Amino acid sequence: MNIKKCKQLLMSLVVLTLAVTCLAPMSKAKAASDPIDINASAAIMIEASSGKILYSKNADKRLPIASMTKMMTEYLLLEAIDQGKVKWDQTYTPDDYVYEISQDNSLSNVPLRKDGKYTVKELYQATAIYSANAAAIAIAEIVAGSETKFVEKMNAKAKELGLTDYKFVNATGLENKDLHGHQPEGTSVNEESEVSAKDMAVLADHLITDYPEILETSSIAKTKFREGTDDEMDMPNWNFMLKGLVSEYKKATVDGLKTGSTDSAGSCFTGTAERNGMRVITVVLNAKGNLHTGRFDETKKMFDYAFDNFSMKEIYAEGDQVKGHKTISVDKGKEKEVGIVTNKAFSLPVKNGEEKNYKAKVTLNKDNLTAPVKKGTKVGKLTAEYTGDEKDYGFLNSDLAGVDLVTKENVEKANWFVLTMRSIGGFFAGIWGSIVDTVTGWF
């Protein structure tokens, strides 16, 4: 072999080595950043109790949400019930608008009689289970007097709950052009409700946390409207992942939450499932694939990823102290410091085999307190920082993530004599320190 060929061979080996070295980390990075591939315009998955995001794709992009809008309608009704402003057994008689929409067979509806009387409970179940549009408008009128005023409440509540990118234009999620010319004042005929996937997760989390009874209704696979009357009608749930339905999910208990579909929104679904104390909330916007099951196929991918790879782990128990942050200084107190502890247990969804990759992160409101100090005074926040190689999506709301650090006991203010003696001691300690520094400087 001549020298020229040797050089060419050596150069080829160098190039090959560099290529393998460079490409290997890139492959690893890609795998880390894309643990699953969700075929939808946007998606997100969170663990409910901690707000930890387990997966996210275009989650901050505002998109049409179709009938998932009814989750806000349900929230406002349940709030009104809780506040005593509306009762389950109070009755409602449809006005011309609600009657007209209820007779539109091209929309999801239970037909309502113009002179009929319907309880709030009946209208709520028709909305939550069968996504009945006229029933949702009726709820809006019951709660706010008109759908226009209800839409104002929807947007105000969205802001209050911490949503950041949203636009609610009606109580149903229908495109306004399908409201037979009755779109709420201040909205145009071409509008429909739009919310980001992340904000839908925020809404779902609040709905389940604030009014967990929603799951008692959203988990009903099928029932009847006005059973035993001339108006009896089957009401199957559009959430096919419920037990006994065509896309039933068997690894965990699916008990909600809301589907949605319009021409512009495509196929959407906010789902929730629980297993072994871990509740997962998912959102899929404009899912691709099969028209009827695509949103459930994509949700299944997220559920599988969560329940196959994560479990809830208690990072700190209630009353635990964090190494390096066991106390905080107290000015003018009988004691010069006080212990600080967690105010409740801190648990997170931890990926299998990665427990060691979670490190405590403490943020104190200030470096010291001033006596008197009451037991249970909040002094800071404890969260966990992921230090592993996998993709970390953070929390749904970083301000609310983690648990509070609070004082372990009371600290009374020291009396004037003790404070005076401390001041004198500090004064002489300062003088002595100056003398020592001066003498030390001579040698």
Swiss-Prot record:
SUPFAM superfamilies: beta-lactamase/transpeptidase-like (SSF56601), Penicillin-binding protein associated domain (SSF69189). SMART domains: PBP5_C. Residues 1-31 form the signal peptide. One of its GO terms (cellular component) is membrane raft. GO terms for molecular function: serine-type D-Ala-D-Ala carboxypeptidase activity. Pfam families: PBP5_C, Peptidase_S11. The active site is at 67 (acyl-ester intermediate), 70 (proton acceptor), 131. Substrate binds at residue 258. It catalyses: Preferential cleavage: (Ac)2-L-Lys-D-Ala-|-D-Ala. Also transpeptidation of peptidyl-alanyl moieties that are N-acyl substituents of D-alanine. GO terms for biological process: cell wall organization; peptidoglycan biosynthetic process; proteolysis; regulation of cell shape. Belongs to the peptidase S11 family. This is D-alanyl-D-alanine carboxypeptidase DacA. It comes from Bacillus subtilis (strain 168).
